[in-house]
Amino acid sequence: MPSSTRTGPGPRGPTPTTTPSSRPSSAPAGEWKQAAAYVEAAGQDWDERWSRVELLQELAQEDDDWLKRWRKAHPESGDAATVRAGLMVHRAWAIRGSAYAHKVSQAHMDTFQRMLPDAMKAAHEASELAPADPGPWVVMLTAARALNYDHGQFSRLFAGLQTRAPYHWAGHLQALQYWCAKWHGSDELMYDFAKRALAAAPPGSVLPGVYLYALDEDGQRSGRRRMGTERRTRGCC
């Protein structure tokens, strides 16, 4: 299992652009209608919609009773299903933690791996309920990285995302994580992906920021390599 130095399943997407008063600061027992309306109000602005889904996932980590009631009241809701699938991935990652793989207990790693297939299944179910929504595909890309999908499998998932939203910010960030050297790629593959995103970005898109994430990822790894070299050098003297 490759390691990640970031807490959770990867970098966050843009902050929702709604005013603080319109965001659900909490979802107390059974109060799911505000959450449903909050996501629905984003319409087909898929980046904004995903940002709202991410916020609901965070709220559900504290108390998911409202989410269960939402799903019970509207089992056909793709939004509720997407929040649930993302929550499952986040909970799996919370058990694994952000430490290097060799520092994660075998029990935690086993539980992490055992939870991920269910999260992937939940994301597929969400995509069937909301076939036009790229959100479930972001969840799939996140889970696929930890499930060790090969390059072909992952590329097919990413193609599914792009069919729905070719410039989706969070989807590209998850893909960048997959292609970086600490997971299933290399520096070359990571930069190739980032350059393609940069070249494809339409005017005004935030997608060129993916390249900045690649530079940051490379810088962090270079810094860790330098620290390791310095420690080895000091140990030899």
Predicted regions and their residues:
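Extreme N-terminal leader/anchor segments
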Residues: M1-H74
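Charge-dense polyanion-binding interfaces
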Residues: S205
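Beta-sheet entry/capping signal
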Residues: S77-D79, H168-A170
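Extended, hydrophobic/aromatic-rich amphipathic alpha-helical segments that build helical scaffolds
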Residues: G78-H90
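Short coil/linker segments at helix-helix boundaries
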Residues: D45-A73, L87-A126, A132, P136-T163, ...
